[in-house]
Amino acid sequence: MQIVDRSNLEASLKLALSPENNPKRNFVQSVEIIVTFKEVDMKKGDLKLREIVVLPKPPEKTKKVLVVPTIQQLEYAKKAEPNTILTKEELQKLQGNKRAIKKIARQNDWFLIAPDSMALVGRILGPALGPRGKFPTPLPNTADISEYILRFKRSTLVKTKDQPQTQVFIGTESQQIADLAENALAVLNVIESKGYAQKVRNIYVKTTMGKVVKVELR
């Protein structure tokens, strides 16, 4: 079951990005899709989403990735140009430096960690990541992790918490409507693949500071 028609999605995105709903700001705004659900009891765990989606049309400004690689992975990590690279030793030196830890947690979107550093990251960065809804993701054991890092630079997160809805980054206002629609459909396809298509109540799109625009469902 396709949740929305692409034409309806593109029409709503065009409206959301119009001057009447999206007054010009002095920064490039993000574009988000909001999906609300019906007939679910969050306390009973009826709706659980935490899915990483690679955007087919990523924005020019990609997500910021922090990497804690092994020694063997270090040069490959540098090749992918993540926002932050920390060696295990540099990570250990952050212990107790709350200001630096909070800055790292704030300035990065994804945290890709070598398996042998996961416990250390949980202990040192965990208290700053948790309240921000961020979490460490293990790196594969292969040496060449450059493609893996690049994948996360192009990714967004579909997640639910305590409310029956998810609000997901799908790009920026500088992108083409067709590209934003393709990214939105990738998000909706994941929701559908998890069996929640029939539970969708409403879908909306908006920019960071703009008005919410409803998308007509099928």
Curated annotation (Swiss-Prot):
The keyword Disulfide bond does not apply. Signal peptide: none annotated. One of its GO terms (cellular component) is large ribosomal subunit. GO terms for biological process: regulation of translation; translation. GO terms for molecular function: rRNA binding; structural constituent of ribosome; tRNA binding. InterPro entries: Ribosomal_uL1, Ribosomal_uL1-like, Ribosomal_uL1/biogenesis, Ribosomal_uL1_3-a/b-sand, Ribosomal_uL1_arc, Ribosomal_uL1_CS. Keywords: Repressor, Ribonucleoprotein, Ribosomal protein, RNA-binding, rRNA-binding, Translation regulation, tRNA-binding. Pfam families: Ribosomal_L1. Gene3D superfamilies: 3.30.190.20, 3.40.50.790. Probably involved in E site tRNA release. Binds directly to 23S rRNA. NCBIfam families: PRK04203.1 (NF003244). Belongs to the universal ribosomal protein uL1 family. Part of the 50S ribosomal subunit. This is Large ribosomal subunit protein uL1. The gene is rpl1.
